[in-house]
Amino acid sequence: MSYAKAISKYIRISPRKARLAAGLIRGLSVSDASLQLTFSGLKGGRLLKKTLDSAVANAETQLDMRRENLKVVEVRVDAGPTLKRAKPKNRGGRHPIMKRTSHFTVIVSNL
């Protein structure tokens, strides 16, 4: 079974929030998944849709698959590196601010 894959790295969203959008499209056809992400209202959905579109384009150009026959086989959201910042607080203290990043992996295949 042939499949096409797309990976987006260092996306500036928390993996926990991005996984909410990933759960919406797991196992759906590509057209349904695209609609679901477009109208989900989630930032993660908007970002994940770009990776899904890239995987579909890879399938169409490299493997000569048709968009209508594609299905989302796997969606993975992994944690990327965390940018650590600090917010100054009273009496010389500070509170940490963790700016988390994510890596998206989307795999599509024929139905």
UniProtKB/Swiss-Prot annotation:
Gene3D superfamilies with a match to the protein in the record: Ribosomal protein L22/L17
CDD domains tied to this protein: Ribosomal_L22
InterPro entries for this protein: Ribosomal_uL22 (IPR001063), Ribosomal_uL22_bac/chlpt-type (IPR005727), Ribosomal_uL22_bac/org-type (IPR047867), Ribosomal_uL22_sf (IPR036394)
GO terms assigned for molecular function: rRNA binding; structural constituent of ribosome
Keywords: Ribonucleoprotein, Ribosomal protein, RNA-binding, rRNA-binding
GO biological process assignments: translation
Gene Ontology CC: one annotated term: cytosolic large ribosomal subunit
SUPFAM superfamilies membership: Ribosomal protein L22
Subunit relationships: Part of the 50S ribosomal subunit.
Record function comment: This protein binds specifically to 23S rRNA; its binding is stimulated by other ribosomal proteins, e.g. L4, L17, and L20. It is important during the early stages of 50S assembly. It makes multiple contacts with different domains of the 23S rRNA in the assembled 50S subunit and ribosome.
Family: Belongs to the universal ribosomal protein uL22 family.
Name the record gives this protein: Large ribosomal subunit protein uL22
Species annotation: Protochlamydia amoebophila (strain UWE25)
Lineage: Bacteria, Pseudomonadati, Chlamydiota, Chlamydiia, Parachlamydiales
